[in-house]
From Swiss-Prot:
Domain tr-type G: 8-282
Function (record text): Catalyzes the GTP-dependent ribosomal translocation step during translation elongation. During this step, the ribosome changes from the pre-translocational (PRE) to the post-translocational (POST) state as the newly formed A-site-bound peptidyl-tRNA and P-site-bound deacylated tRNA move to the P and E sites, respectively. Catalyzes the coordinated movement of the two tRNA molecules, the mRNA and conformational changes in the ribosome.
One Gene Ontology molecular-function label: GTP binding
GO biological process, one term: ribosome disassembly
Family, similarity comment: Belongs to the TRAFAC class translation factor GTPase superfamily. Classic translation factor GTPase family. EF-G/EF-2 subfamily.
Binding site for GTP: 17-24, 81-85, 135-138
Keyword tags: Cytoplasm, Elongation factor, GTP-binding, Nucleotide-binding, Protein biosynthesis
Classification via CDD domains: EF-G (cd01886), EFG_III (cd16262), EFG_mtEFG1_IV (cd01434), EFG_mtEFG_C (cd03713), EFG_mtEFG_II (cd04088)
GO cellular component terms given for this protein: cytoplasm
Pfam families with a match to the protein in the record: EFG_C (PF00679), EFG_III (PF14492), EFG_IV (PF03764), GTP_EFTU (PF00009), GTP_EFTU_D2 (PF03144)
Subcellular location: Cytoplasm
SMART domains: EFG_C, EFG_IV
Protein name, UniProt field: Elongation factor G
């Protein structure tokens, strides 16, 4: 099977947004116009093409990022639909990792919202070029230029309108293209026929002003254009497009478009912009990786002739074909039925069949080429973030980093007979989702599951019931507290046991000190003259790492500290690794009294949107939850309150907010950072943990 679309004519894009900005509807319309769907599915009716897990259709939100392929004007566009709900941030991270560009969808009434900020930051981390689609222009309170302003103010993004809406709310009739200087009016409800006309007189001045500022902004990124612009020469449409493309691909410029996916306006222009401004796999820098046995860096060019390399970015269990592994090919080609190397795990894998996905239908293909996104059937050991490569040319592509869970609950099957079934279900779900963890508490024997928020765990429990037919009871949520040191001290740890024959002897002096936030545990060996022999150093480090997991104050893992091993002693006969391991853990225990240990709790960034009359109640409620209000602003006819609130105080907030605002308030929350717990609360936590 020969290559159908050249690499230059391939686009791998994601569609990212805040919950409810209309992302799934936008994707639907793209599939409709590119000829993959014959009838448009509405999210409100629960019949959307991309939302194919039962729960997604019920809740009207997108949880798993389905990858789908479409064609537009002779190009292949691979689309990854990413969830906008904050509990599924990992899905967004893993899809951004394999994209070349993205369309950020905003709600024309709200502009940039908290989850938009989170997703935007993730996209910046991975250097993903973006175009912005301001959707829902038909909605009451829609304001295009306000939305463009929020991109600049809240995200400090160099964003500029390349379109201007004609009318808004109910009078939204068409779109002015500022690049080509023409107005498009829609002639039918499906938006397939539009007519290009002259820009209406009442919009001429505004369009000219915006076009001038667009040209100026783009010229700043391109010296040749700058010279032409300063000399007052006319800049052609092609030159302008090329400059916007260059700025966008370099992640220095963000073109902003407008429309209403629900009313079928503006989506084809978004597709055109994807082809015009977002990069092909050949436009992005070649992917870097390392050799498995050394840390030597190698690159893989985006070409069919290079050795095969791919990254697995999603694992799913499919009722018909079993385990599906979604992967992005960075270089080379792969035939179904062939063998590849999973270099991350050092295992050989056989690719049974290769499927190209279209939301929930699939087409079997025999070969995938560089730049393609597809799903493989038959991989046994591959999980999210693993590299697959040619057996003779090994490489490990950079993997993804997944956040630790911030909330834990105990779970047990409703009937004891289901215990094994539940264990299997949890193992499968953890394989699909790296931010979900399941383990057995060694002390209580309970099964504990952890995730990114209440909704995340609700959906896991729900999926167990539907997909694995296991009903479970869930305990009260537990917060993932941490501990750290606020002071430095030098401490001794000595373990001596003499009982006839061979004894045990380990002796260390360690200096503990606070580390920067987020840096984790750092161990330094500063032994001189072999007072602790080199072969025991790893045992000291391992002993500390084990002991850190059990905490020093209330049994929570200790984070962000440095430990410097600087002195100690040993015994020729009695010293062994075990003794030094125990000595190190004793040193950590002794540090508890000297290093001023504190308990840390996860703090969430919360944004509440409410009608003005509930403002007082909500502010009072946030303060009673130990929250700090960071800012307030009007948005349309609602008020937005932004606050930092401890996660432990936010359980059940959805219910409280509903009753406080008669169901008219909404909120979103994102884990932000760890902060010290006030003394009174720390005492309660310690008492509770000792009482157990």
């Amino acid at each position: 099977m020969a290559r159908e679309f050249s690499l230059e004519k391939t686009r791998n894009i994601g569609i990212m947004a805040h919950i409810d900005a209309g992302k799934t509807t936008t994707t639907e319309r793209i599939l409709f116009y590119t000829g993959r769907i014959h009838k448009i599915g509405e999210t409100h009716e629960g019949a959307s093409q991309m939302d194919w897990m039962e729960q997604e259709q019920e809740r009207g939100i997108t949880i798993t990022s389905a990858a789908t392929t479409a064609q537009w004007k002779g190009y292949r566009v691979n689309i990854i639909d990413t969830p906008g709900h904050v509990d599924f941030t990992v899905e967004v991270e893993r899809s951004l990792r394999v994209l070349d560009g993205a369309v950020a969808v905003l709600d024309a009434q709200s502009g940039v919202e908290p989850q938009t900020e989170t997703v935007w930051r993730q996209a910046t981390t991975y250097g993903v070029p973006r175009i912005v689609f301001v959707n829902k222009m038909d909605k009451t309170g829609a304001d295009f230029l306000y939305s463009v302003g929020t991109l600049r103010d809240r995200l400090e993004a160099n964003a500029h309108a390349i379109q201007l809406p004609i009318g808004a709310e109910d009078n939204f009739e068409g779109i002015i293209d500022l690049v080509e200087n023409v107005a498009y009016y829609y002639e039918d409800d499906l938006g397939t026929r539009s007519e290009a006309r002259e820009i209406p007189a009442e919009y001429k001045d505004k369009a000219e002003e915006l076009r001038a500022s667009l040209i100026e902004a783009v010229a700043e990124l391109d010296e040749e254009l700058m010279m032409k612009y300063l000399e007052g020469e006319e800049i052609t449409v092609d030159e302008l497009k090329a400059a916007i493309r260059k700025g966008t691909c370099n992640v220095e410029f963000y073109p902003v478009l407008c429309g209403s996916a629900f009313k079928n306006k503006g989506v084809q222009l978004v597709l055109d912009a994807v082809l015009d401004y977002l990069p092909a796999p050949t436009d992005v820098p070649a992917i870097k990786g390392t050799l498995p046995d050394s840390d030597e860096e190698v690159t893989r060019e985006s070409s069919d002739d290079a050795p095969f390399s791919a990254l697995a970015f999603k694992v799913m269990t499919d009722p018909y074909v079993g385990k599906l592994t979604f992967f992005r090919v960075y270089s080379g080609t792969l035939d179904s039925g062939s063998y590849v190397r999973n270099s991350t795990k050092g295992k050989r894998e056989r690719v049974g069949r290769i499927l190209q996905m279209h939301a929930n239908s699939r087409e079997e293909i025999s070969t995938v080429y560089a730049g393609d996104i597809a799903a493989a059937v038959g991989l046994k050991d591959t999980t999210t973030g693993d590299t697959l490569c040619d057996e003779k040319n090994l490489v490990i592509l950079e993997s993804m980093e997944f956040p630790e869970p911030v909330i834990h609950v105990a779970i047990e099957p409703k009937s004891k007979a289901d215990q094994d079934k539940m264990s299997t279900a949890l193992a499968k779900l953890a394989e699909e989702d790296p931010t979900f963890r399941a383990h057995t508490d060694p002390e209580t024997g309970q099964t504990i599951i952890g995730g990114m928020g209440e909704l995340h765990l609700d959906i896991i429990v729900d999926r167990m019931k539907r997909e694995f037919k296991v009903e479970a009871n869930v305990g009260a949520p537990q917060v993932a507290y941490r501990e750290t040191f606020r002071a430095s001290a030098q401490v001794e740890g000595k373990f001596v046991r003499q009982s006839g024959g061979r004894g045990q002897f380990g002796h260390v002096w360690i200096e503990f000190s606070p580390n920067e936030e987020g840096k984790g545990f750092e161990f330094e060996n500063a032994i001189v003259g072999g007072v602790v022999p080199r072969e025991y150093i790893p045992a000291v480090q391992a002993g500390l790492e084990d002991a850190l997991q059990n905490g020093v104050v209330a049994g929570y893992p200790v984070i962000d500290i440095k430990a410097k091993l600087f002195d100690g002693s040993y015994h020729d006969v009695d010293s062994n690794e075990m003794a030094f391991k125990i000595a190190a853990s004793m040193a950590l225990k002794n540090a508890a009294s000297k290093c001023n240990p504190v308990i840390l709790e996860p703090i969430s960034k919360v944004e509440v949107v409410i009608p003005e009359e509930y403002m007082g109640d909500i502010m009072g409620d946030i303060t009673s939850r130990r929250g700090r209000v960071e800012g307030m602003e009007g948005r349309g006819n609602a008020q937005v309150v932004r606050a930092m609130v401890p996660l432990s105080e936010m359980f059940g907030y959805a219910t409280a907010l509903r009753s406080n605002t008669q169901g008219r308030g909404t909120f979103t929350m994102v884990f932000d950072h760890y902060e010290e717990v006030p003394k009174s609360i720390a005492d309660e936590i310690i008492k509770k943990n000792q009482g157990e």
